[in-house]
Amino acid sequence: MEDIKPNVELKSTQEQSVPTEGSELLNDYDLTKAHETENVDGTEGPANEDEDIGDDSMKVKDEYSERDENVLKPEPMGNAEEPEIPYSYSREYNEYENIKLERHVVSYDSSRPTSGKMNCDVCGLSCISFNVLMVHKRSHTGERPFQCNQCGASFTQKGNLLRHIKLHTGEKPFKCHLCNYACQRRDALTGHLRTHSVEKPYKCEFCGRSYKQRSSLEEHKERCRTFLQSTDLGETASVEARHIKAEMGSERALVLDRLASNVAKRKSSMPQKFIGEKRHCFDVSYNPSYMYEKESEMIQTRMMDQAINNAISYLGAEALRPLVQTPPAPTSEMVPVISSMYPIALTRAEMPNGAPQELEKKNIHLPEKSLPSERGLSPTNSGHDSTDTDSNHEERQNHIYQQNPMVPPRARNGMPLLKEGPRSYDLLKPPPICPRDSIKVINKEGEVTDVYRCDHCRVLFLDYVMFTIHMGCHGFRDPFECNMCGYRSHDRYEFSSHIARGEHRAMLK
């Protein structure tokens, strides 16, 4: 076996030094190969261990012979199917070479269609480049080569990793040129810039209301379609809605929207029905004839505006300061003007000469015909926009107040009630709307207390602020339309359930 290696080296050296002997070199190679095979077969001893060495030598000679063949051949290969070289690989190498060739042809045909795109062999997705295809295949394999060295989060693309790193560094490269807002993503800055724009490109074709975002418009359209289907008005309702929108001022609409959102955010200021404590006893005789029967008996818009302003002052005017100026507290100069509008119940110490009997003698009871005008003082939100009606209301109110000058509340025993000093909002609130001979609310001490009634819901309130908040929930022109979200109820039961459940919160923008 030792004689084989020198012969192989000698043969290779001779082949390199004599490149001009063409056919003789190939013949010598065949004879030498046959001679070496006979020597290997006839060699005694551990011949199996040296078979690998013989194979390596054959590979080396194959490579050299291929080089010499290329050098000696002057003409290029014309036909690949009929090669002129009488040399071929052994059977074992041909088997593997065929497998590689088949794989190459199949992958080339499937991933390289005629359009130039590459297809995913798993789902068939077409990609424009090889890099895009590799990123897509990571979604099938689950490979995430880009990993954060701080928290260990992995990503399929480098851009996502760079965006994630900004969370750790706190970098906010995208800044608003109008305010101090800064963010990490460009799309977030684009959405923020819409808040500075005055225009509202997304407009509802049903009612004409406009929004800055498409999502807000879609939510509004669902409610608007529901409204049109429930009322069954169709195109007529759309025209009326546009007319109402034109009548209502933009400033007033902004105030109401801010007020509704503020009420929704404050759970403590949500309108609540007065149930009453157990120690209070009620002596109520309700007369259904006091309900409004005509639209001309509804309250004028001046009282409605006052109720809204009182609710705004109670809920907090900081959020509404750019739109509404909170009226200041009444001073000594304003009290005479307010007293001419509303009678102020004075205590015994404030009465002249401390004699309430003189005032009681001056009290003139009103006939039954004046009851509808008293009910007109209820600060409801169902206003009738008519100048003639407003002037008639004012004339009747002045006539009533002149005949009813500052009567203190009295108990059953005929003694006047002692009250604490009037608070700031007590000077502006109207007198109780319910006639004392029809509805009386008596506390545990047997004293008659002031009561405020919502004629739409038939609910009594002992607190004027809660009464004002409740009346602010009624719609302007339809008392059973929610002033927060626009939901229209069929009766007072559905309206009360809607307010109690707070369904309007999900409808707010």
Curated annotation (Swiss-Prot):
Residue spans of biased composition, Polar residues class: 10-20
Similarity comment text for this entry: Belongs to the Ikaros C2H2-type zinc-finger protein family.
A Pfam cross-reference name: zf-C2H2
GO cellular component terms, semicolon-separated: cytoplasm; nucleus
Bias (Basic and acidic residues): 56-72, 385-398
Keyword Cell membrane included in the entry's annotation: no
Domain remarks: C2H2-type 5 and C2H2-type 6 mediate homodimerization and heterodimerization.
Domain of life of the native organism: Eukaryota
Function of the protein: Transcription factor that plays an important role in the regulation of lymphocyte differentiation. Plays an essential role in regulation of B-cell differentiation, proliferation and maturation to an effector state. Involved in regulating BCL2 expression and controlling apoptosis in T-cells in an IL2-dependent manner.
Gene Ontology BP term (one): regulation of apoptotic process
UniProt entry keywords in alphabetical sequence: B-cell activation, Cytoplasm, DNA-binding, Isopeptide bond, Metal-binding, Nucleus, Phosphoprotein, Repeat, Transcription, Transcription regulation, Ubl conjugation, Zinc, Zinc-finger
Protein known as: Zinc finger protein Aiolos
Annotated region described as Disordered, given as residue ranges: 1-85, 365-421
Assembly behavior: Homodimer. Heterodimer with other IKAROS family members. Interacts with IKZF4 and IKZF5. Interacts with IKZF1. Interacts with HRAS. Interacts with FOXP3; this interaction may be required for silencing target genes and regulating the suppressive activity of FOXP3-positive regulatory T-cells (Treg). Interacts with BCL21L; this interaction blocks the anti-apoptotic role of BCL21L. Associates with histone deacetylase complexes containing HDAC1, MTA2 and SIN3A.
GO-annotated molecular function: DNA-binding transcription activator activity, RNA polymerase II-specific; DNA-binding transcription factor activity; protein heterodimerization activity; protein homodimerization activity; RNA polymerase II cis-regulatory region sequence-specific DNA binding; sequence-specific DNA binding; zinc ion binding
Phosphothreonine, modified sites: 20, 326
The gene coding this protein: IKZF3
Subcellular location: Nucleus; Cytoplasm
Zn finger limits (C2H2-type): 118-140, 146-168, 174-196, 202-224, 452-474, 480-504
InterPro entries xrefs: Ikaros_C2H2-ZF (IPR050589), Znf_C2H2_sf (IPR036236), Znf_C2H2_type (IPR013087)
Crosslink position(s): Glycyl lysine isopeptide (Lys-Gly) (interchain with G-Cter in SUMO2): 61, 73, 100, 245
Region (Mediates homodimerization and heterodimerization): 452-504
Modified residues (Phosphoserine): 378
